[in-house]
């Protein structure tokens, strides 16, 4: 088999799994559906590793499948490509997806929608692979929309729950709004360059109008803001926790929310040419890093805390990408995928043991009955905090170093505060769930099944060792992404400041919550502000109410009393006129002769008057 053909294998195997599971969607749980889908993604992962090795040896591939759209001079083919950027992405996507599939076999074993779930899950993986393997913007957009559709189906998987329905609709609508911006960017690209192929577009940037590049980069980033839940399009991310927990692991670690970061990295020649937009992305990312972390400080929902940490970490990635450190952004995406999926799967174990209760203040003393899960979640939390030698240390510190080295000291300080917040809420969660006094009434909390724990093991290992791939990773990526200039920074001092601040934050969280929540100060203004997400969802609700009121007025007054009244009047007028003229068609010979004579007289009068 040619290696270019392997691209098709990697891409279409998850689709085959999705279609296979769909055949049994309305039937009772069939274990073979979960096993078959897991094997499909496993083979896809093996193929991705083979392709990664080829890319490592300076091989790049293109696979033209068929003409997709041909209209005049406009031609778009369904074609795939492999370079160093998406070689990393497909390995991350398929590895995390395979482990989530295996974990899901146990997690969803008692769910009536088992088969349907795997159909959606594999479809999700396929859509993400379309997004990252496409060699043009339109193909990327199709994968982009596929990811949005599958996320809607998975977030609202338990459609009998009103909260799940609302969350899925919110995610879908919010992403459709921002996707319109991305579509505008793609239209402008074709309008100005006459092509949507990455290579052709990027090769013509030097001769393009700067203002047009500015608009294109802004519109594309609007799309990224929706998928990666950047402020103010962030509210759907926490509500997406209504879906099954393994879905959260996939959305937050390897697929949907990383798509926006991937887009900026993929379009790095464009954003390097428009530095104002890049700087805005970095500033917004720093704000979101702090913003997301602050909301996690007080939240009591286990999954939402981890979700807010994703929001915060995406901010770090966008800071790196916005400052032109695209390789560092991709490296943090790479390491983050492992410890974030580990945290979500661990949360799923805890949720099952607690009989679906997610309030961390009503847990406690779970370390002994769930020792392995506790160890995995501690590993994930330490990696998230960025403590040496765990993976997060290498990637997050690189972002802080880049911000400081480029003299963006305010951004660096915001990221430092975000790191301190991250350490605090991470170990607040760990202490309240595993080590604080028992606050629940579950008699025998149990550990997850062995094969579910085994599926978490590779993630736990990678959360520890992935950072040590730093040097070969940057060497590999620098072949296609410009390297960041080396800056003279007091590296030892920066690392010391960050590490000491994070360790002090961890120590404070351990000390504060070792006996559970004892403080009664959780009713203050700041607490309520953070717990209610700065009241932004309520603001959106009020805005929606205004439009709902306007729509109601238009319906009740304009449509019913004006438009409908006009239409009804016209209808009644026609009916009345019809009744008047109906007598001419009553079949009475005398009446018909009268009308005939009247018609002749009218015609004669008309001719006499106008015929002169």
Locations of regions flagged by a protein language model:
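Aromatic-capped, Gly/Pro-kinked transmembrane alpha-helices
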Residues: 477-490, 517-612
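Membrane-entry segments of alpha-helical transmembrane domains in multi-pass membrane proteins
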Residues: 1-12, 28-35, 75-92, 130-143, ...
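Hydrophobic transmembrane alpha-helices and their helix-loop junctions in integral membrane proteins
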Residues: 94-140, 149-451, 456, 462, ...
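Hydrophobic core of alpha-helical transmembrane segments in multi-pass integral membrane proteins
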Residues: 41-52, 98, 186, 496-510
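Membrane-interfacial helical/loop segments at transmembrane boundaries in membrane proteins
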Residues: 61-75, 199-205, 398-402, 472-489
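Transmembrane helix-loop-helix hairpins at membrane boundaries of multipass inner-membrane proteins
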Residues: 1-8, 20-119, 192-210, 214, ...
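Hydrophobic alpha-helical membrane-embedded segments
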Residues: 49, 340, 420-427, 499-521
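Hard-cation-handling environments
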Residues: 445-508
């Amino acid at each position: 088999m040619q290696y270019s053909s392997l691209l098709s294998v990697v891409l279409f195997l998850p689709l085959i799994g999705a279609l296979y599971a769909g055949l049994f969607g309305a039937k009772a749980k069939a274990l073979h559906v979960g096993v078959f889908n897991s094997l499909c993604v496993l083979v896809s992962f093996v193929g991705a590793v083979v392709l990664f090795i080829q890319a490592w040896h300076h091989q790049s591939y293109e696979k033209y499948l068929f003409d997709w759209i041909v209209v005049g001079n406009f031609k778009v083919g369904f074609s795939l490509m492999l370079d160093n950027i998406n070689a990393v992405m497909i390995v991350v996507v398929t590895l995390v997806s395979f482990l989530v599939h295996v974990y899901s076999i146990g997690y969803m074993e008692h769910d009536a929608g088992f088969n349907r779930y795997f159909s959606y899950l594999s479809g999700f993986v396929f859509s993400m692979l379309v997004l990252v393997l496409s060699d043009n913007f339109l193909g990327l957009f199709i994968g982009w929309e596929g990811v949005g559709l599958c996320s809607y189906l998975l977030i609202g998987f338990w459609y009998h729950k009103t909260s799940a329905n609302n969350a899925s609709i919110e995610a879908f609508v919010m992403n459709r709004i921002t996707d319109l911006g991305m579509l505008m960017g793609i239209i402008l690209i074709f309008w100005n360059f006459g092509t949507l192929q990455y290579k052709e577009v990027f090769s013509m940037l030097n001769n393009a109008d700067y203002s047009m590049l500015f608009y294109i980069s802004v519109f594309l980033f609007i799309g990224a803001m929706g998928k990666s839940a950047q402020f103010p399009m962030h509210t759907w991310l926490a509500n997406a926790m209504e879906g099954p927990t393994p879905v959260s692991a996939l959305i937050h670690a390897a697929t949907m929310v990383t798509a926006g970061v991937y887009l900026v990295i993929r379009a790095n020649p464009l954003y390097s040419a428009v530095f104002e937009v890049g700087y805005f992305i970095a500033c917004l990312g720093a704000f979101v890093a702090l913003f997301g972390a602050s909301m996690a400080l007080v939240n009591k929902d286990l999954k939402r805390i981890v979700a807010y940490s994703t929001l915060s970490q995406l901010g770090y990635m966008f800071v790196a990408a916005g400052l032109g450190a695209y390789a560092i952004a991709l490296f943090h995406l790479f390491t983050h995928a492992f410890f974030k999926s580990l945290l979500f799967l661990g949360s799923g174990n805890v949720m099952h043991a607690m009989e679906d209760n997610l309030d961390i203040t009503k847990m406690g003393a779970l370390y002994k009955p769930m020792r392995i899960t506790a160890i995995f979640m501690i590993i994930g939390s330490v990696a998230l905090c960025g403590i040496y030698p765990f993976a997060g240390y290498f990637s997050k510190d690189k972002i802080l170093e880049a911000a400081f080295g480029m003299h963006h000291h305010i951004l660096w300080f915001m990221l430092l505060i975000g790191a301190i917040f991250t350490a605090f809420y991470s170990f607040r969660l760990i202490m309240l769930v595993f080590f604080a006094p028992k606050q629940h009434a579950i008699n025998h909390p149990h550990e997850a099944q062995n094969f579910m724990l085994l599926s978490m093991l590779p993630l736990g290992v990678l959360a520890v060792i992935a950072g040590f791939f730093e040097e070969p990773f940057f060497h590999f990526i620098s072949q296609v992404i410009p390297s960041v200039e080396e800056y003279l920074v007091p590296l030892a001092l920066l690392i010391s400041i960050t590490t000491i601040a994070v360790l002090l934050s961890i120590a404070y969280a351990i000390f504060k919550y070792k006996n559970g929540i004892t403080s009664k100060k959780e009713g203050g203004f700041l607490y309520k502000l953070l717990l209610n997400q700065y009241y932004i969802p309520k603001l959106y609700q009020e805005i929606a109410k205004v439009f709902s009121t306007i729509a109601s007025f238009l319906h009740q007054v304009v449509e019913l009393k004006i438009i409908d009244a006009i239409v009804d009047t016209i209808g009644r007028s026609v009916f009345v006129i019809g009744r008047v003229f109906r007598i001419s068609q009553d079949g009475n010979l005398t009446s018909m002769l009268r009308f005939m004579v009247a018609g002749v007289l009218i015609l004669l009068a008309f001719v006499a008057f106008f015929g002169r």
